[in-house]
Amino acid sequence: MCDDDETTALVCDNGSGLVKAGFAGDDAPRAVFPSIVGRPRHQGVMVGMGQKDSYVGDEAQSKRGILTLKYPIEHGIITNWDDMEKIWHHTFYNELRVAPEEHPTLLTEAPLNPKANREKMTQIMFETFNVPAMYVAIQAVLSLYASGRTTGIVLDSGDGVTHNVPIYEGYALPHAIMRLDLAGRDLTDYLMKILTERGYSFVTTAEREIVRDIKEKLCYVALDFENEMATAASSSSLEKSYELPDGQVITIGNERFRCPETLFQPSFIGMESAGIHETAYNSIMKCDIDIRKDLYANNVLSGGTTMYPGIADRMQKEITALAPSTMKIKIIAPPERKYSVWIGGSILASLSTFQQMWISKQEYDEAGPSIVHRKCF
């Protein structure tokens, strides 16, 4: 598939935290970079340094010390279209090195997003990048494809949004979708806050990236939160150290599991919402009684925020406590779940049966951006 023939479709999973992009038919994305646009916060004095007024992705990340970093996608919704266009431009021309006008493009979106978001995406793809065809798929549905199932309930949690999507025989059940605007970025913010209690101050947008790294390397989900807190209080067995970029070493203890515990107890950050185990259960209970058994047996985790060690065991324990006692409950945590949305997109876009699903440039010209609601689930 990779002789990059004229027609290979592009798959671009625009997450709130990471952009995953590549070619349909590949088994992993070619480009994975942060969804960041950085602008200098200082005056340039060196002439001929080729300083730019904005940096995207990894380059912004590496120069973060002198930049103000902004994420154009918040809670799965694109809030800054000019920056988003920069990110897409960077994806096509610098990362994948393709001409978008030659490739059909599959984009992804969180469920229950505002309709306008999807229309504007469609408009930019056709009018700015002149793609020949495009499609917008729901992220959780793609994750289920990637796990090789057609029935299951997906818990997809990324950097910006967490949602439970029950899918039966390939149909998402929109009335039972639960969306929780609590995800990786909120956990990073919370970790910044509780590290301050230890006397470590992290405030700038660049320092937030350091905390995100601490979170990804050291945090885990406790099977029993109260027990773990007691253990942490009585011994130092749970403490780990982390070296900051300037060589200073900091120690973190109970923060390691207090941070992701927020997923199960959103009240930690003042959110009046059920935890991810309850939203999963509530979502199943909103489905028809006949299909619940199949959903309980196929809880699929997807997205970077489900990568914490211990999260699958904890989900198993919590859902078992809520469900009927005889129910068989299975949590599926594929090792590649960080990219399963992208992998599902790659599978979908390379299916021969999918080829009639694309929205073509011609259809767009005739109907305008609203066609996306008719053609894409």
From Swiss-Prot:
One of its GO terms (molecular function) is ATP binding. It is found in: Cytoplasm, Cytoskeleton. Keywords: Acetylation, ATP-binding, Cytoplasm, Cytoskeleton, Hydrolase, Methylation, Muscle protein, Nucleotide-binding, Oxidation. The modification N-acetylaspartate is found at residue 3. Its main location: cytoplasm. Its EC number is 3.6.4.-. Pfam families: Actin. One of its GO terms (cellular component) is cytoplasm. The modification Methionine (R)-sulfoxide is found at residues 46, 49. Gene3D superfamilies: 3.30.420.40, Actin, Chain A, domain 4. Disulfide bonds: none annotated. The modification Tele-methylhistidine is found at residue 75. The keyword Ribosomal protein does not apply. Oxidation of Met-46 and Met-49 by MICALs (MICAL1, MICAL2 or MICAL3) to form methionine sulfoxide promotes actin filament depolymerization. MICAL1 and MICAL2 produce the (R)-S-oxide form. The (R)-S-oxide form is reverted by MSRB1 and MSRB2, which promotes actin repolymerization. Monomethylation at Lys-86 (K86me1) regulates actin-myosin interaction and actomyosin-dependent processes. Demethylation by ALKBH4 is required for maintaining actomyosin dynamics supporting normal cleavage furrow ingression during cytokinesis and cell migration. The modification N-acetylcysteine is found at residue 2. It is an enzyme of class 3 (hydrolase). The modification N6-methyllysine is found at residue 86. Predominantly expressed in heart. Lower levels in skeletal muscle and skin. It catalyses: ATP + H2O = ADP + phosphate + H(+). The keyword Nucleus does not apply. SUPFAM superfamilies: Actin-like ATPase domain. Belongs to the actin family. Polymerization of globular actin (G-actin) leads to a structural filament (F-actin) in the form of a two-stranded helix. Each actin can bind to 4 others. Actins are highly conserved proteins that are involved in various types of cell motility and are ubiquitously expressed in all eukaryotic cells. In vertebrates 3 main groups of actin isoforms, alpha, beta and gamma have been identified. The alpha actins are found in muscle tissues and are a major constituent of the contractile apparatus. The beta and gamma actins coexist in most cell types as components of the cytoskeleton and as mediators of internal cell motility. There are three genes coding for cardiac actin in Fugu. This is Actin, alpha cardiac muscle. It comes from Takifugu rubripes (Japanese pufferfish).
